[in-house]
């Protein structure tokens, strides 16, 4: 499972303005690993899987990793921007970073595979990668090249799809990978337990995008304004209380269900349901 509502932890720390989030009605308790597990349990599953914090629109910095660890995430997913130092040969994408809140395991995506998996060409000159078929062929060929590069070395390479990737494309890629005899498909938990490529108390990300931070601040302002209007409606426009003997006449659905008596015993404070919006 991942952080609730795909909360952007990287933007949260880049903005560094907790008050702005709270004004918009967003608290840290809403996106921690405990809340993610609670939401998963609501679906009826008794066993809770591992929780992973996925990268948002900004890079994973030491502050962002610390915030993720404080919120209960000891493993995060990163794109190729996590380590600005690119090597010629591919390597296991597992890193361990010591943060003030504890160690965080970072699973970094392999850049070329990730680019192709997201439906993008590796360069503007790669005309053969202008179609799904071309990108899929390059993806399989690239994975074979990595195997030939170091045939006797076990490496864990991470590849992710984008949030908007179509299911049909995912099915094509995974079907092709399943038929590739040189590949061994595994899970995030196995990769997280692999010997890390690097262990340190710092990170070397690409430069953060200031535009993303500005967009976050603008979105929070809009949320705060909307929340203010909704709460004003709850306190100034809606009635604070309805007498229980009025409920049956005001709620025809209760009469149809023949549970008007039960409905009458419910709290009729509109701020309760307003607060859940």
Where do the PLM segments sit?
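Catalytic grooves of carbohydrate-active enzymes
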Residues: 28-46, 58-82, 100-277
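Conserved, mostly hydrophobic/aromatic
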Residues: 53
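Short acidic-hydrophobic surface loop/beta-edge motif
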Residues: 92-101
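Short, charged, surface-exposed secondary-structure boundary motifs
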Residues: 84-92
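Glycine-rich phosphate-binding "P-loop"
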Residues: 2-40
């Amino acid at each position: 499972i991942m952080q609730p509502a795909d909360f952007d932890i990287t933007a949260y720390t880049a903005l560094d303005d907790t008050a702005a989030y709270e004004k918009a009605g967003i608290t840290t308790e809403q996106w921690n690993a405990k809340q993610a597990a609670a939401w998963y349990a609501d679906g009826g599953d008794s066993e809770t899987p591992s929780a992973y914090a996925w990268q948002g629109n900004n890079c994973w910095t030491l502050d962002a990793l610390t915030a993720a660890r404080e919120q209960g995430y000891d493993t995060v997913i990163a794109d190729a921007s996590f380590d600005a130092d690119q090597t010629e040969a591919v390597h296991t994408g597992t890193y361990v970073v010591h943060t003030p809140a504890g160690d965080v395991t970072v699973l970094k995506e392999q850049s070329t595979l990730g680019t192709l998996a997201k439906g993008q060409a590796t360069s503007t000159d790669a005309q053969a990668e202008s179609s799904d078929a071309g990108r899929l062929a390059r993806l399989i060929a690239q994975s074979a090249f990595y195997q030939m590069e170091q045939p006797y070395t076990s490496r864990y390479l991470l590849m992710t799809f984008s949030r908007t990737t179509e299911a049909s494309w995912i099915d094509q890629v995974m079907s092709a990978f399943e038929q590739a005899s040189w590949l061994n498909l595994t899970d995030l938990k196995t990769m997280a337990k692999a010997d890390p490529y690097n262990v340190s108390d710092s990170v070397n990300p690409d430069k953060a995008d200031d535009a993303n931070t500005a967009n976050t601040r603008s979105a929070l302002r809009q949320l705060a304004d909307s929340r203010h209007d909704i709460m004003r409606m709850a306190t100034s426009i809606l009635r604070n209380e309805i007498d229980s003997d009025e409920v049956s006449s005001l709620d025809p659905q209760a009469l149809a269900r023949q549970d008007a008596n039960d409905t009458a015993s419910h709290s009729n404070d509109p701020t309760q349901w307003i607060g859940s919006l």
